[in-house]
């Protein structure tokens, strides 16, 4: 008989606490960056940081609440959809500071990349809320594609930023891609366990 495989209580608590730590760090560093932007009267930088904070906090808050809920809660499945949708916002938000500042005056690179990642975020949110599967290759590929999209503007970025900033941007993209791949492999493992249990 087929049965649903859930994360253990300890795994869910760890996920909830780790993501709540992201909320705290996001608020602390976000406040520091916003204060700097206001002091410098950098309007575009302020907009970029705000979008980044919205995406990051949306991701961490929804994930914290989702993992903190009991598996029997009627809200668990609803929060799972928002948890997935928030990942798109987190990635798009990460691109906002560089596209609205460094790349904004580099021809079509800034607004083109900004429009692309936020369009992906909007479409991804709609897809997640309408019909979210336990595992979706399209979702995983979209996460990876958004993470790699910075490569199309790598030349103007390299011409405008110091090497230390480039390293941070590349590292962030690698983290997104690695996270998406691990998430995909983990879901495949649970799906194979479900099929095995269903045959017993």
Name the predicted role of every residue range.
Residues 1-193:
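Multi-pass alpha-helical transmembrane bundles in non-GPCR membrane proteins
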Residues 194-200:
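Conserved small/polar residues in nucleotide/adenosyl-binding loops
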